[in-house]
Swiss-Prot record:
One of its GO terms (biological process) is translation. One of the primary rRNA binding proteins, it binds specifically to the 5'-end of 16S ribosomal RNA. The gene is rpsQ. This is Small ribosomal subunit protein uS17. Gene3D superfamilies: Nucleic acid-binding proteins. It comes from Campylobacter jejuni subsp. doylei (strain ATCC BAA-1458 / RM4099 / 269.97). Belongs to the universal ribosomal protein uS17 family. GO terms for cellular component: cytosolic small ribosomal subunit. One of its GO terms (molecular function) is structural constituent of ribosome.
Length: 83
């Protein structure tokens, strides 16, 4: 079985029906200055049951492309956000 990539991030927007936008943070070492810097990227996640809210911390797993920009499915909700 193939390795499925997992990402963890915070829901920043309800992007539509069964779709949420998740902000993922990663830390990398700057090649010249050797300082740890934060890099951010937004992913569209498929949420079949519309169970997440803005501010929730979620885990998503890679799947087949569901649309032009959506290729991750919701796996679990780690923490609920404060609204």
């Amino acid at each position: 079985m193939a390795f499925k990539r997992e990402i963890q991030g915070v829901v920043v927007k309800i992007a539509g029906e069964k779709t949420v936008s998740v902000l993922v943070e990663r830390k990398v070492v700057h090649p010249k200055y050797r300082k740890i810097v934060k890099r951010f990227k937004k992913y569209l996640i498929h949420d079949e049951r519309n169970e997440v809210k803005v501010g929730d911390t979620v885990v998503a797993v890679e799947c087949r492309p569901l649309s032009k920009r959506k290729s991750f499915r919701l796996k679990s909700v780690l923490a609920t956000g404060v609204e």
